[in-house]
């Protein structure tokens, strides 16, 4: 059925409270108290106000221990902490701030404190300018390397993310039309003007303590009238004599050989030449990091 109305709304006064009304309400409560019945209080105090209006006027403006004015930094921190844990339960927050009303705290949050919090979380205005300036001041060679690598990185449209080096190798060998390049550390890339090479890095073995990185190099070696397709695998690793590590390398090599046998020499040439027509330079790792080489001939 719903709650019964606290008063006859047709015969009560609405709008701002006058100083005379404030004086009547304050004088009555100081002498008689609330009596626990706010519905009957307006009639006893001689006010044409609703009981709810009298209660809010007393709690938010007229009670003697109420505090008005600016909030301190300590109060701000308490409001931040409680708001993060319980949300906008202003009456509960007001219970932790002596002399503050839930109405004052709510108004203070909406008008000042929330804006102050947002301003502290926003990045400084010169942040984006600094990023743009540092990007434009990069050397032309570094910028060209960055653009080339971005344009040649393997991309999987179904998952909307870059492929791992091992996935990139498999997709290239399965008939992709574009050449795939991958490099984890851009500082290790330099130009090599002598040959057109396809360099791909293998996936780092996370289960091993030693660093195990590799690349696949496909090159054309012409000797007299004969042309030999050479697959060179360059191993760069810290020496590890563990037998399990050795067997893992042999499995990797045999898998690559099976994939390569499915493609003829002309198909491999076409894959290499299609990616190198726009530039005669190729990417190569720092030779100082190469420890040993293994040659597989086909």
UniProtKB/Swiss-Prot annotation:
<keyword id="KW-0677">Repeat</keyword>
<dbReference type="GO" id="GO:0005634">
    <property type="term" value="C:nucleus"/>
</dbReference>
<feature type="DNA-binding region" description="H-T-H motif">
    <location>
        <begin position="90"/>
        <end position="113"/>
    </location>
</feature>
<dbReference type="GO" id="GO:0003700">
    <property type="term" value="F:DNA-binding transcription factor activity"/>
</dbReference>
<dbReference type="InterPro" id="IPR001005">
    <property type="entry name" value="SANT/Myb"/>
</dbReference>
<protein>
    <recommendedName>
        <fullName>Transcription factor RAX2</fullName>
    </recommendedName>
</protein>
<dbReference type="GO" id="GO:0003677">
    <property type="term" value="F:DNA binding"/>
</dbReference>
<dbReference type="Pfam" id="PF00249">
    <property type="entry name" value="Myb_DNA-binding"/>
</dbReference>
<feature type="DNA-binding region" description="H-T-H motif">
    <location>
        <begin position="38"/>
        <end position="62"/>
    </location>
</feature>
<feature type="domain" description="HTH myb-type 1">
    <location>
        <begin position="9"/>
        <end position="62"/>
    </location>
</feature>
<dbReference type="InterPro" id="IPR017930">
    <property type="entry name" value="Myb_dom"/>
</dbReference>
<keyword id="KW-0805">Transcription regulation</keyword>
<keyword id="KW-0217">Developmental protein</keyword>
<dbReference type="InterPro" id="IPR009057">
    <property type="entry name" value="Homeodomain-like_sf"/>
</dbReference>
<keyword id="KW-0539">Nucleus</keyword>
<keyword id="KW-0010">Activator</keyword>
<dbReference type="GO" id="GO:0009785">
    <property type="term" value="P:blue light signaling pathway"/>
</dbReference>
<comment type="function">
    <text>Transcription activator. Positively regulates axillary meristems (AMs) formation and development, especially during inflorescence.</text>
</comment>
<keyword id="KW-0238">DNA-binding</keyword>
<feature type="domain" description="HTH myb-type 2">
    <location>
        <begin position="63"/>
        <end position="117"/>
    </location>
</feature>
<keyword id="KW-0804">Transcription</keyword>
């Amino acid at each position: 059925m719903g709650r019964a109305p606290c008063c006859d709304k047709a015969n009560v006064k609405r709008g701002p409270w006058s100083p005379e009304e404030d004086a009547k309400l304050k004088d009555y409560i100081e002498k008689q108290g609330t009596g626990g019945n706010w519905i009957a209080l307006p009639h006893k105090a001689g006010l044409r106000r609703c009981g709810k209006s009298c209660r809010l006027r007393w709690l938010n403006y007229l009670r003697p221990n109420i505090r008005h004015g600016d909030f301190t930094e300590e109060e701000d921190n308490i409001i931040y902490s409680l708001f993060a844990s319980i949300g906008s339960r202003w009456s509960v927050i007001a219970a932790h701030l002596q002399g503050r009303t839930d109405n004052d705290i709510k108004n203070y949050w909406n008008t000042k404190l929330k804006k102050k919090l947002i301003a502290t979380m926003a990045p400084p205005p010169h942040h984006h300018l600094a990023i743009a300036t540092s990007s434009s001041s990069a050397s032309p060679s570094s910028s060209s390397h960055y653009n080339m690598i971005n344009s040649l990185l393997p991309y999987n449209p179904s998952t909307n993310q870059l492929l791992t080096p091992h996935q990139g190798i498999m997709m290239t060998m399965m008939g992709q039309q574009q050449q795939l390049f991958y490099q984890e550390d851009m500082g290790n890339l330099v130009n090599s003007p002598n040959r057109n090479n396809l360099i791909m890095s293998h996936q780092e073995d996370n289960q091993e303590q030693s660093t195990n990185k590799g690349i696949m190099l496909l090159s054309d070696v012409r000797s007299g009238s004969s042309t030999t397709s050479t697959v060179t695998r360059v191993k760069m690793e810290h020496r590890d004599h563990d037998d399990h590590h050795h067997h893992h390398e042999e499995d990797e090599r045999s898998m690559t050989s099976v994939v390569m046998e499915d493609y003829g020499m002309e198909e491999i040439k076409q894959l290499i030449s299609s990616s190198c027509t726009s530039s005669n330079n190729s990417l190569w790792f720092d030779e100082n990091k190469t420890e040993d080489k293994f040659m597989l001939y086909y």
